[in-house]
Structures are given as C-alpha cells and as structure tokens.
A protein has these predicted regions:
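The Walker A (P-loop) glycine that initiates the GxxxxGKT/S ATP-binding motif of P-loop NTPases
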Residues: 218, 278, 300
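Walker B catalytic acidic pair
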Residues: 293, 299-300, 311
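Basic, amphipathic alpha-helical bundle interface domains used for macromolecular binding and assembly
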Residues: 41-46, 61, 68-78, 283, ...
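Residues immediately C-terminal
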Residues: 112, 296-297, 303-304
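Walker A/P-loop
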Residues: 215-256, 318
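P-loop NTPase nucleotide-binding/switch module
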Residues: 169-206, 210, 238-288
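Short loop/turn elements that form and flank the Walker-type P-loop nucleotide-binding site
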Residues: 60-63, 100-101, 131, 150, ...
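Peripheral, non-AAA+ core regions of ATP-driven protein-machinery
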Residues: 1-215, 219-225, 324, 460, ...
Length: 495
C-alpha cells in the first residue's frame, strides 16, 4: 500500500481536534515533505522519525514521501505527532498491515533510538478520544493520566518496536487498567493555625460559602496571607467531573497539581498580563485559568501593574477569558474565586494606632488609586485585618479547624444548589428578586446605605448576594436585618 491514514489529536485551547495524518509514498528522488500548517516542532519530526524507524529494525523508504496533516487550516504544534507519522510511513511502505489502526489514535514523541517520550495535554486528548469511541496508544509515562477516564481503552508503550509488535500480533500490549486516582484532600494548611482575627475568619467563611471575592486590607504581619492560604481547606471538594476538568487544564499547561484539591494560585506582583490571562502564538492557559474552580490570590494588590489588574474585570464577571488571534479565538475557563490583600499605604502602617506611618495624605491617596474603582466594585467583601495584641498571640485556647468550618460551608452549599442550582455569587438580578426578599426594615436599611455610601447598581446587587449567603450559613430561609447589616459591614466605603 502506498497510502496510509493514521489518527491523532491537536491541541487548541482546551479542545483536542482530530488530525488525520496521511502518508503517500511515490517514485522520485528520496525526500520527506510535511504539509498542512505544521509548525517548527512538527517539521523537525522528519529527522526524529527517520532515525527512530531505522533504529527500531525497520526500513526507511528511499522514495518520495508526502505527509499531509488534515485539516490543513488547523495549526499543528508539538512533538506528539512523531508516533503517528512513523506508523503511517510503516503502513504506507507495507511494513505494517493495513486497517489494523483504524479505531486507534496515537500520540507520542520519538527519541532517535525509537523510545517514546511523554507529551503534554494527554488527559484532554484522551477525553476527546473517548468521545470519538477510539482507543488510544501513547507513551508509558502518560498512561496513568489517560487511564483516569472510566471505561476507556489505553495502550501504553516504551518503544516504537513495541507498538509495531502489537499490530503485527507478535507481542500484544495489555490494556492499561483504569486508575482510581487517590483524591488528595489533605491540605498542608489549616484555619486552626490562625490566631485571633475572628472577623476576618468570619469573612473568609462567608466567601467560601457563597463563592464571593474578598479583599483583605491591613498593615504587614497581621495574617492576610495566612488567612488567604487557608481558603482552599474550607471549600467543598471537587466532584469527579470538576477534577477531570482541572486536571486537563494542568495537563495542557504541563504543571503539577494535587488531584482532588482545589487549585490555589498566587502569582507574584511582577506578573505580566499574558502570565495572568494566558496567551502566546498558540495560546496557553494563564494564572486565572490555572485557578479555575479554585482560588486566585493576589498579594500586595497595589503593586501589580494597573493594566494587569484591569484585565481581571471581564473574567470576574463572565468566568471565562477569550484570547483573540488573527485567525481564531480561544476561550479558556476562568471560574476562579478572587482573594486579594493590600496594605493601606506605601509603608503599610496608615491608620495604625502606634502612629508609625510617615506617608503623606497625597501618597496614601496615590497608592490606593492604583486599584481602579471598577475593579474594587467587583469585589464582594472588603475587610480590615488589624494588628494582633500580645494576649491574642499568647492565647492557647483551641480555635475551629478547617474541617469544622467546612461542614458549615457544605451545608450552605447544599442550600444554594437545592434552591437555585448554583452559588449565590452568580445570582442574576432576576434571581435576586426571587430569592432575596427583604422585609420592610431591611429595605429601608439598604436604601439608606445606598444613599450614604453612594453604591453602584453592581455593589447593591453584591450586598444582596452576600446577605443571602449569610442567611444560608444561619440556615435561614428569610434574610433578616442582622444578615443585611453584616453584609453592609463588609462593603466598607468602596463602591
């Protein structure tokens, strides 16, 4: 047979489109041409494939080889196409039987000696392969990742010769058994580590229960970072589908992640906009996507470049980020929970009782203006974190651990899911009218607050959402005036 077709997958955002590798062998001067919008790593595969075929004991044809990667308008990058290209050549030259690979897809980079090397995006590719009802052949190092999918046939090999022996019926490769991933629910941080700070701890619990964004403000050393790092430990565990969704993102990004834990990302304040939202010629996920279904913590918020912070405004509302390129748009999920921390002034000690702050009123104003009003308006809870007194630090009275707080958060979660099918932070204005019914006292209270604090419509709705969460934590169907009062206290003077 002089023509062969092999199936593989590309990566486009979080999708894995099907790619057909067509190999044609014809008479002519020995050459190997790859067409179909192949990028550098794919074009270089011709040398790896030639050496791998020869070193695996097969013949590399001394004829004209044309390899077409279809569809032609889809960019192909990475070295995962090495294995399908090599197998296509072997089938087209009659060294492997025809049609035995029809219900298979192949990914894998080839070493010069024929060994298979691991590739990125395995889980995303495996999920697409499963939907297509195909089997998957891949490098041994990627087997456990792909085998997380139930009822999916995965074949793993160390060497090109091993793959060929499987299809020659010389030595069959066993199906990799489905891996029941051990969910790592043990967090190294616990809220019991935090001394004092009852009000900030309460705000953290409310944020966890309703999925709300939160801003901690206070001088250095008061526990802002400590509190933020405890948030994942009080959040409900991811369900199996969410686990796979998060794992596929980290697979594409080629980044380590503890399976079963909610992501916690804390980029440095020198991070660029591309590092935060993602990008590149073939766009890759940024920090907000890596924090999907988890927590994005921005410490020293005013130290971030203002343009970098402004890119957060759209994904905070839409829960996704769209990256546009000349030929296409890539959409990445960005359903993260924003937790931020900041000092009140450049030195950090403004409004402190010990009068250490030497910053002028103008410098304090300039420092705080680095964060735009529209961004602050999108943060649900604003909370001051005061310095701890000596007796609070020395207090040995046991405080609530994360497991205890998480029980209350889980209960509030269930109330919300049963009532409206989602968390309170995502309630639309129409849903607010249905699920947030205020009595006469509360209505007067919110009207007065709107006038005094000059609340925007967005801030008004966010206060109602927070009050709904506080009521859910109290297991109350109706929102009481005490719930609304507490929600207003977390709004501060920013609106």
């Amino acid at each position: 047979m002089s023509l062969a077709k092999i199936y593989t997958r590309g990566l486009l955002g979080l999708h894995a489109p099907l790619i057909e590798v067509e190999v044609h062998v014809s008479a002519g001067l020995p050459s190997l041409t790859i067409v179909g919008l192949a990028e550098a790593a794919v074009r270089e595969s011709k040398d790896r494939v030639r050496s791998a075929i020869i070193n695996s004991g097969f013949q590399f044809p001394t004829k004209r080889l044309t390899i077409n990667l279809a569809p032609a308008d889809l960019p192909k990058d990475g070295s995962r196409l090495d294995l399908p290209i090599a197998l296509g050549i072997l089938i087209a030259t009659g060294q492997l039987p025809e049609n035995v690979t029809d219900d298979f897809e192949f990914i894998g980079e080839l070493a010069l000696d024929g060994h298979l090397r691991p590739v990125t995006g395995t889980l995303t590719i495996a999920m697409a392969c499963q939907l297509a009802k195909h089997q998957l052949m891949l490098p041994q190092e990627n087997a456990d990742e792909a085998a997380q999918l139930p009822e999916f046939k995965v074949f793993a090999a160390h060497h090109l010769k091993q793959v060929c022996d499987h299809f020659l019926n010389t030595q069959k490769i066993e199906v990799t058994s489905t891996q029941k991933s051990t969910l790592d629910k043990q967090y190294k941080f616990d809220s019991a580590d935090v001394k004092g700070q009852l009000r900030p701890r309460r705000a953290l619990e409310i944020a966890a229960a309703g999925g709300h964004s939160l801003l901690f403000k206070g001088p250095p050393g008061t526990g802002k970072t400590l509190l933020a790092s405890r948030l994942p430990s009080i959040l409900p565990a991811l369900n199996p589908q969410e686990n796979l969704e998060v794992a596929s993102i980290y697979s594409i990004a080629n980044t380590q992640h503890h399976f079963g834990q909610r992501p916690f990302r804390a980029p440095h304040h020198t991070a660029s906009a591309i590092a935060l939202v993602g990008g590149g010629s073939n766009p890759k996920p940024g920090e907000i996507t890596l924090a999907h279904l988890g927590v994005l913590f921005l410490d020293e918020l005013p130290e971030f470049d203002k343009k970098v912070l402004e890119v957060l405004r759209q994904p905070l509302e839409s829960k996704e980020i769209i990256i546009s390129r000349a030929s296409r748009q890539i959409t990445f999920p960005a359903n993260f929970q924003l937790i931020a921390a900041m000092n009140p002034c450049p030195c950090g000690y403004a409004f402190n009782q010990d009068s250490r702050c030497q910053c002028s009123a103008e410098s304090i104003k300039r420092y705080q203006s680095r964060i735009s009003g529209p961004l602050l308006d999108r943060i649900d809870l604003h909370i001051d974190v005061p310095p701890l007194k000596a007796q609070e630090l020395q207090d040995t009275t046991p405080v609530e651990d994360s497991a205890t707080v998480r029980e209350r958060v889980l209960q509030a979660f269930h109330f919300q899911i049963q009532r409206q099918g989602g968390l309170n932070h995502a309630l639309s204005p129409k849903q607010l009218e249905k699920h947030v019914v205020l009595d006469e006292t509360s209505q007067k209270m919110i009207e007065m607050a709107q006038q005094r604090l000059n609340l925007s419509a967005r801030a008004y709705h966010r206060i109602l959402r927070v009050s709904r969460t506080i009521a859910d934590l109290a297991q109350s169907e109706q929102i009481q005036s005490t719930h609304l009062t507490e929600a207003l206290s977390y709004r501060g003077t920013q609106s």
